[in-house]
């Protein structure tokens, strides 16, 4: 869910092994080609039931939303598969979804975020998905420019979920522990410390459920990797 604590506040292979096709490429990388990196962490597969549900929804729900995801990808330069994976993690691709905290639509936009992204009808898949894509791009632009993909994309997705302020807190904690605050694997390992008073008491934005955000990004990466098997429109083959 975007902007859970205010507006200050992206496979089954290892996270970051391949940036989803079409995601914004780092400097020096040809646009549209995947940026690759060594797997920063080793993680478990999707739970069997979740993987089964996801594959079923690729057949039943994704076709109704694919055009909005592809249009948002053209607008932002972020790969449609990554956007679709993010949307699935947020709402299970349900345009009428509403969270207990008031986030709405496919990309689970909070009302103030939707307004800032120019969304007038939050339950319109076209508007909501475009708004979510623009918000992710906004988060990516707020991640320090020196950080290259794929780390920058995963950090931006974490910020989409937890807010840029809490992400910066997690990066500071990572640095305190003499790890690399520009490397997603290191930040991911330290995100859970935002719920530990020994650490969040030393941060600007305080408590946050960082473990939830770490899993959020992991799920997005897993869904995006599975979506790599979905062919482009008009493509032949499996």
What do the PLM-derived regions correspond to, one by one?
Residues 1-14:
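N-terminal secretory signal peptides and thylakoid transit peptides that target proteins
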